[in-house]
Design a protein with these regions (language model features):
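ABC ATP-binding cassette signature C-motif
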Residues: 1-189
Length: 189
């Protein structure tokens, strides 16, 4: 629901305006024929569309310019390049030739290049080897936005979580700390 893939059965989803949300699926859907650069640039689809419309003189140019600037869009190619370098990805590689773990990195880069306020991760350690998981943990610890993740990887949760939220039989309960702290708090209940 937060990623916009499903509609709630009832109620209202409210997100503060200008909040950027990025979602990394458990099994990333990337264009197999794309280069890694192009696949990551898909994370800036809105920016690229606005720049194209602006360049062609379509629509309200002042409003488009303001939105492009608010999205830090004029330097989108540089952002893609910097993100690829940070994640140690070859921009010229073709997606179909990549391992599952590298495809996951491409999907993460696609999300991160958009500079999201909220990063949604569905089983982020799937397809990753131990070195890649440690790399991901470091990346997430340094992430300045909010992260919501669904995972069965308890070690990963211990290393990155600052709060565990449990949904059980329609009740939402929040526990400060990592997974180990959550287990202690549950035991005390």
């Amino acid at each position: 629901i937060l990623a916009g893939l499903e509609k709630p059965d009832d109620g209202l989803v409210q997100v503060q305006s200008n909040t950027r949300i990025a979602y990394v699926a458990q099994e990333p859907q990337l264009d197999a024929a794309s280069s890694v650069f192009d696949a990551v640039a898909e994370g800036l689809q809105r920016v690229r569309y606005l720049i194209d419309e602006y360049s062609q003189g379509h629509g309200d140019l002042d409003a488009m310019q303001s939105e492009i600037e608010s999205l830090d869009g004029w330097n989108w190619e540089q952002r893609v390049t910097e993100t690829l370098q940070r994640l140690h990805l070859n921009p010229e590689a073709i997606v179909s030739t990549l391992s599952g773990g590298t495809k996951k990195r491409v999907a993460l880069a696609q999300a991160l290049v958009a500079q999201p306020d909220v990063l949604l991760l569905d089983e982020p350690t799937n397809h990753l080897d131990l070195d890649s998981i440690e790399w991901l943990e470091g990346l997430l610890v340094d992430f300045t936005g909010s992260i919501i993740t669904i995972t069965h990887d308890r070690s990963f949760l211990d290393n990155v979580a600052t709060r565990i939220v449990e949904l059980d039989r329609g009740k939402l309960l929040s526990y400060p700390g990592n997974f180990a702290a959550y287990l202690l708090q549950k035991e005390e209940q």
